[in-house]
Every structure is written in C-alpha cells, then in structure tokens.
Amino acid sequence: MQQKCYYEILNISKTASGVEIKRAYRKLAMKYHPDRNPGDKEAEIKFKEISEAYEILSDDSKRSRYDQFGHAGVNQQSGFGGTGGFEDIFDTFFGGGTSRGSNRSRASRGSDLEYTLEITLEEAFFGVEKEITIPRMESCDSCDGTGSKSRSKTTCHACHGQGTIRRQQGFFAFEQTCPVCNGTGYSITDPCDACYGNGKVKKQKTLKVKIPEGVDNGDRIRLQGEGDSGSNGAMNGDLYVQIIIKEHKIFERRDINLYCEMPISFTKACLGGDIKVPTLDGEVVLKVVPETQTGKVFRLREKGMKSLRGHRRGDLLCKVVVETPVNLSAEQKELLEKFADSLGEDYQSKHAPKSKTWFDNVKDYAKKFFE
C-alpha cells in the first residue's frame, strides 16, 4: 500500500517552516488525540499518521532525507533498512562489503517507540514527574534472548551466517536480506515456547518521566535506551514522549505568553479600582484605571510560561470585557435613567469618545452618497 505524503497529512506546503509544521501538528493532534475520541479507530489511525509525519518533518536531517528519497529514506521498515540513509540505499542497489552487510544483519538496534502524554497547563507551568506504562519488546528470559530452548543456534545454510545473499541482475549486483533466516545468519531447530523463536517478548514497562517547566504542545522528551530491545547485543531503541497540553478554562497559551479575558463591572470600569486576577501561581491585584473601555489589555509581566531555552518568563495579558448589568430592579432602572439624563445632550462628545468617533465616521461615509 502506498504511504501518504507527510506534507499532505499535516496539510502544509513542502516549503513550510519549522514553526508552521509545529502549529499544524498541534492543531491536528488536539483534534484526533485518542483521549478526545475514545473508541474511534479512524481517529487513532489518523493520530498515528500525524505523529509519524511530525517526527520526520520536525527533524531537519530526517526531513532532508525524506525530501530526497521519500519514505524509503526514513522508513526503518523499508527495503533499505536501519538508519544508514543514503549509504544503505546505494549499497542496496550496487552492492556493499559483505562484512558490512553481515554486521548489520547480526546486530540490530531496537526500534524507537513513541508515547503521547497529555498534561495540564498547570503541570506544564510548574513541571511535573509522571509515571507511564508502555508496551515494549524485551529480551526473552526463558531462552536468554536466543530464541532457542537449548540456547544454541545453527548457522544458516543459505547465507552461511552472513545474513544476506548476493544476487546478480545484468550488470548490477545487489545484496538482500536472506529469506531463510530473515537476516539473522542462523536458524533455530528448537524454538523457545515463550517467544516462539523470536528471542523477544512483549512486556509492560513502567517508567517515570520528568516534564520540565515551560514544555509546550508537540515537544518531545527522549528517554534513551527505553525503546525496544536490540538484537544480538545491539543497543536498545529510544522512547520519545510527545507532550499534549489540555485546553484551559481561563488561559490561552501563545508561545511563552498567556492570554485571558477579564470581565469587570460597569461601575468598576467607570470609577476604576483594584481587582483580583488569577494567575497560574496565585492571585495578583491589578489596578484598573478609571474610564477603562472593553478591549483594553493589561500586561502582568513574568506571569506567563518559562522559556525552555533560557531563564526568561513570558507575560500574562488580560483583556478587559465590561459587563452590562442584567436583571435590574425598577429602582435600579430609574437610577440609570436619571444618570443618563445627567449626562446631557452632548453625551457622545464628552462621555463616549469611541461612540462619537463611530457616528462621525458613519456620517462622513453617508455624505458620499448624498452629496
């Protein structure tokens, strides 16, 4: 089956910047995250595709190989094998040293794994240690990873222990994985009952992950050696923990700054005064100046997120929303009417500068049609 284009999966162009790639991933990951779509297999598949595309395109080296060679340049499961990039592709078509092919087949690094971890904005603000449980392939204890009950192996008769066989097509010679032993270089006559001759079994592993303060959506934390077990003494793969931050009821995050809307009363907007504003690390008192209008933004410095790339902390920007009183009593309505009368006929010019400007603009606009 033909694999989908990573750029199409993220709905971005091939010239997209790193910021655009991250933004596209964040948007789609939030939409298709399994926790938000329980039991939805299509969403789960879509989320895996999105994560795979982001893993490749967010890495400059992998993206470069993908742009040059397509999926074959980055897919460990392709016919090019491993992580050798262009050299492995070249060797596959034009042949390589026999010893190099043997070494690659005999010792195989474990696969990298990926785990998606959803945390709160508060946890991203303060940092947190999380415990996760992952399924991974580990060396079989019953056969010590040999795949054999007797822990003995027989040299493969087809490749003579090399793990690869050499074929000739016209003028070209190329190597391919031995189909008899699947590249191991040996055969097993008494397969282990626990791992069925694979030398590995799937186990559940519980790990603790330290999340640094300031982590953002789409960030990945690498746990070296916590992926699948390697074969024949090779290194284990790595575990990459991708961070998804839940939406917050009050705050919206943009880079290291936080944003919120702050409702204030009609009287507070007119007269000014102190109000308590919630932040992620406690309440602060904000002084509202008299005659504050809806839309005014107050900046609380260093009340945002910490930068992972330095000691700088972002700001919290609070946008004022003046609330109109509701459920007024007859007495309150009467008082407001008296208040309105007290403003006089020149209300707009003296007491509502924005309204005056708006009406003046409307009049100027209308004149164009009646002059």
From Swiss-Prot:
InterPro entries: DnaJ, DnaJ_C, DnaJ_domain, DnaJ_domain_CS, HSP40/DnaJ_pept-bd, HSP_DnaJ_Cys-rich_dom, HSP_DnaJ_Cys-rich_dom_sf, J_dom_sf. Keywords: Chaperone, Cytoplasm, DNA replication, Metal-binding, Repeat, Stress response, Zinc, Zinc-finger. CXXCXGXG motif repeats lie at residues 140-147, 156-163, 178-185, 192-199. Zn(2+) 1 binds at residues 140, 143, 192, 195. Pfam families: DnaJ (PF00226), DnaJ_C (PF01556), DnaJ_CXXCXGXG (PF00684). GO terms for cellular component: cytoplasm. GO terms for molecular function: ATP binding; heat shock protein binding; unfolded protein binding; zinc ion binding. Residues 5-70 form the J domain. The keyword DNA-binding does not apply. Coiled coil: none annotated. Zn(2+) 2 binds at residues 156, 159, 178, 181. GO terms for biological process: chaperone cofactor-dependent protein refolding; DNA replication; protein refolding; response to heat. Homodimer. The J domain is necessary and sufficient to stimulate DnaK ATPase activity. Zinc center 1 plays an important role in the autonomous, DnaK-independent chaperone activity of DnaJ. Zinc center 2 is essential for interaction with DnaK and for DnaJ activity. This is Chaperone protein DnaJ. The lineage of its organism: Bacteria, Pseudomonadati, Pseudomonadota, Gammaproteobacteria, Thiotrichales. The gene is dnaJ.
